[in-house]
From Swiss-Prot:
Protein's name according to its UniProt entry: Something about silencing protein 5
Misc: Present with 1800 molecules/cell in log phase SD medium.
Disruption outcome: Heterochromatin spreading downstream of the silent mating-type locus HMR.
Assembly and interaction partners: Component of the SAS complex, at least composed of SAS2, SAS4 and SAS5. These three proteins constitute the core of the complex, and are sufficient to acetylate histones.
Amino acid sequence: MDHSIEVTFRVKTQQVIIPEQNIRGNELPLRRWQMELLMLDATGKEVEPTILSKCIYHLHSSFKQPKRRLNSLPFFIKETGWGEFNLKIECFFIGNAGKFSIEHDLTFEDDAYAVDYTVDVPHEFSHLNSELSKYFDLPWKVVSPEEEMSLRIADLPWIKSLALIDEDMMTDVVQMILNDPAVQRAIENHPRREQFFMFITQLPDDLLMKIQAFLKLPNKNSTKQERTNFGSDAIHKDEPVKAHNKLK
């Protein structure tokens, strides 16, 4: 099963020369320019990128405030300057579901232009799924976070057995969780200065199945090496598709 859906983001740029300037010699004229990040829905219509929680524009270092962090929609900036440059636009998915970057060129060849960028958006996060379903026909079932939590808790009675295992087995279970790529990605994308919490029902299904199978290993018949080998599966399994930008 595919782990992502392709979504197109559009960066729209407009610029104009500021009138009545006293330009001397080879001086370049000052311009006002603005830039906005949008998303295209399934029909190609421009919509606000509500699947993003924040956006950071990394402008040229000559600007007084080159790093522009926008924590809410619209992801729009307005500036004045005379030079063209390449900038990075850092985008963060809602629900700590990852991030991606766009490399965009600010040019003055046209008064207005738009550039599209295609991004693979991961689907293993319920909050992100719910928002995506407003714009796309998803190839998987979408449930609310509350429904997902209720369904998975009801289907995982074996979780109670975690309270009964010994310290060595608990250490192995924790290591399996920390070695999982999806968990590692969630940790990496979480703000470093904030505490990180993850409920067991938020873990990927394949990881939960491995933990369940691991807990069924009879303690008296399974050696430490067997448990170690079982837990290492999380390290060698195929990496999930990650969000990334495909520049056109």
